[in-house]
């Protein structure tokens, strides 16, 4: 009588382990991708901090939104939603000066990594903080997020 329930339980457990449980290799791969994202965000922040022209600095005061809580990879959906406005602001700023990096390539790489890390789940809705942040603050907060993911 209990044999069927036991077999069902074992089958379900095996299915969950095979399909859903993270393995050490997937965790390592995730950490490598987060490390890549961290490096790209730091490069972007460095580039923004190199702007010396006051007009460019004013452009970088454009306001962005941060989620109320950013602790899991699914919260990268919130970063993904802010990438296009950030790229637009940086492209305008870059057109006013001669910068050493290609913003478009860097933003494409960041976007690709974010989409890979957050997965195809699109039902997650970001809850944004009411307080807005500058581009520098946005990048600093996401850099901190990446560092916390790597350290766990």
From Swiss-Prot:
Signal peptide annotation: 1-20
Glycosylated residues, chain numbering: 23
Record-linked SUPFAM superfamilies: 4-helical cytokines (SSF47266)
Transmembrane segments: none
Record's keyword terms, sorted: Adaptive immunity, Cytokine, Disulfide bond, Glycoprotein, Growth factor, Immunity, Secreted, Signal
Location of this chain's protein in the cell: Secreted
One Gene Ontology CC term in the entry: extracellular space
Disulfide bonds: 78-126
A Pfam family it matches: IL2
One Gene Ontology MF term: cytokine activity
Entry-linked Gene3D superfamilies: 1.20.1250.10
Single Gene Ontology BP annotation: adaptive immune response
Free-text function comment from the UniProt entry: Cytokine produced by activated CD4-positive helper T-cells and to a lesser extend activated CD8-positive T-cells and natural killer (NK) cells that plays pivotal roles in the immune response and tolerance. Binds to a receptor complex composed of either the high-affinity trimeric IL-2R (IL2RA/CD25, IL2RB/CD122 and IL2RG/CD132) or the low-affinity dimeric IL-2R (IL2RB and IL2RG). Interaction with the receptor leads to oligomerization and conformation changes in the IL-2R subunits resulting in downstream signaling starting with phosphorylation of JAK1 and JAK3.
Family named by the database record: Belongs to the IL-2 family.
Official protein name in the record: Interleukin-2
Biological source species: Orcinus orca (Killer whale)
Source species taxonomy: Eukaryota, Metazoa, Chordata, Craniata, Vertebrata
